[in-house]
Amino acid sequence: MPESQIIELGTLGQIPLYSLERALQDPLRAVKLRRQIVSQHQATGNIDFTTDGSALPYEGYDYKAVLGACCENVIGYMPIPVGVAGPIKINGKMVFLPMSTTEGALVASTNRGCMAINAGGGVTALVLGDGMTRAPIVRFPSLEEAGAAKQWLGSDAGFLIIEDAFNASSRFARLQNIKATAVGSDLYIRFTASTGDAMGMNMISKGVEQALEAMQKHGFESMDVVSLSGNFCADKKPAAVNWIEGRGKTVTAQATIPEHAVRETLKTSVEALVELNVSKNLVGSAVAGALGGFNAHAANVVTAIYLATGQDPAQNVQSSNTLTVMKNVNGDLQISVFMPSIEVGTVGGGTVLGPQKAMLHMMGVQGADPEQPGRNAQELALLVAAGVLAGELSLCSALSAGSLVKSHLTHNRKKG
């Protein structure tokens, strides 16, 4: 079929946009024709828009990697600037942090934080917990049956049955614990499992399906699955359960900044930083009723690293849960962050794309760790926490010194 006919039929809605790759067996050609269809469609006809005349690029991209994994109805790709902060010394290693952002001053500020941290010997960071969660809703005919199911899930015998079924779903998924809450005759069951180097949402969802099937075969035939996700997980929304129980990687990171580095590099004082952190990040956040937001701008750094490394950017909602603490220790500044729900992976999702894969490689965490599954994803979580630590340190320093507006005018505004 001639391209002109494909475009005409697509414009009229007789060929679905999503079917072009399958019909043409050529991802790049499908993207090119879809751009033409969008340009000639009545939805764009009255705004003088053409994809070919736009600044949205489409050539020179690996659409085979995108197909069936990352995006649908593709018409191009969105270039976002990528900068590097650092290198920063973390657990004895020097690492550059890639950050993809359009916010001027963010990379420069984080880089300044890295310099100050290195002056004190670097960051020490630990993974305190590692478990992705999924929480389905199941429904029973009566409250009594829901209560019996909750009790069974909490028993050793019940857990073993569920564990066997869950673990059989994957080489890497390993069930850690189950937490069930009954609301009337509905039961919300929060499964927590390790998922290797994958972020793990698909993996754990598959395991949960098999676990629920096993449950129905062991005395709970009347149980109906309302939804595989019941928001008790909780994914991509603020939730106290993630702050308290953790989700993904639970991480803490700490550094000591010598007084001279605070004064010379950060242009402030230890006393001013400690006071500002209490007034802003602790008291101010409490006044706001913040949930997981006891920090200055953790989400800025988390999202920038996520975009650069192929993570799910929507998961910055819970991944940015951060408590920032600053103390005066013998005249020097001790700064730490606690991040209970960093959700990252080094395989799957956007990590299959070439540019994102390259940034993971630069950080030394690309792909699956062949010797210790999960180690690369844990290392990435530590690097995210180190970046957040640097970002918190620098922004709070700018606020305490009154230089925030000046720095943004320097890096975020073009003259003329």
Swiss-Prot record:
Involved pathway(s): Metabolic intermediate biosynthesis; (R)-mevalonate biosynthesis; (R)-mevalonate from acetyl-CoA: step 3/3
Which residues does the Swiss-Prot or TrEMBL record annotate as the active site?
E103 (charge relay system), K236 (charge relay system), D312 (charge relay system), H408 (proton donor)
What CDD domains does its record include?
HMG-CoA_reductase_classI
Entries under SUPFAM superfamilies matching the protein: NAD-binding domain of HMG-CoA reductase, Substrate-binding domain of HMG-CoA reductase
Query: Where do transmembrane segments lie in this chain?
Result: 380-400
What's the main place this protein lives? membrane
Molecular function in Gene Ontology? hydroxymethylglutaryl-CoA reductase (NADPH) activity
Induction summary = Expression is positively regulated by the cluster-specific transcription factor pbcR.
- Protein keywords: Glycoprotein, Lipid biosynthesis, Lipid metabolism, Membrane, NADP, Oxidoreductase, Steroid biosynthesis, Steroid metabolism, Sterol biosynthesis, Sterol metabolism, Transmembrane, Transmembrane helix
**EC assignment:** 1.1.1.34
Q: Where is the signal peptide?
A: none
Pfam family of the protein (one): HMG-CoA_red
Cell location: Membrane
Positions annotated as glycosylated: N167, N277
**Record keywords: RNA-binding included?**
no
Q: Which GO terms describe its cellular component?
A: endoplasmic reticulum membrane; peroxisomal membrane
- Origin superkingdom: Eukaryota
Question: What's the stated role of this polypeptide?
Answer: 3-hydroxy-3-methylglutaryl coenzyme A reductase; part of the gene cluster that mediates the biosynthesis of the diterpene ent-pimara-8(14),15-diene (PD). Within the cluster, the HMG-CoA reductase AN1593 functions in the mevalonate pathway, which produces isoprenoid precursors. The geranylgeranyl pyrophosphate (GGPP) synthase AN1592 is needed in the formation of GGPP, the precursor for diterpenes. Lastly, the pimaradiene synthase pbcA performs the 2 cyclization steps that convert GGPP to ent-pimara-8(14),15-diene.
Identify its protein family: Belongs to the HMG-CoA reductase family.
Specify the protein name. Answer: 3-hydroxy-3-methylglutaryl coenzyme A reductase AN1593
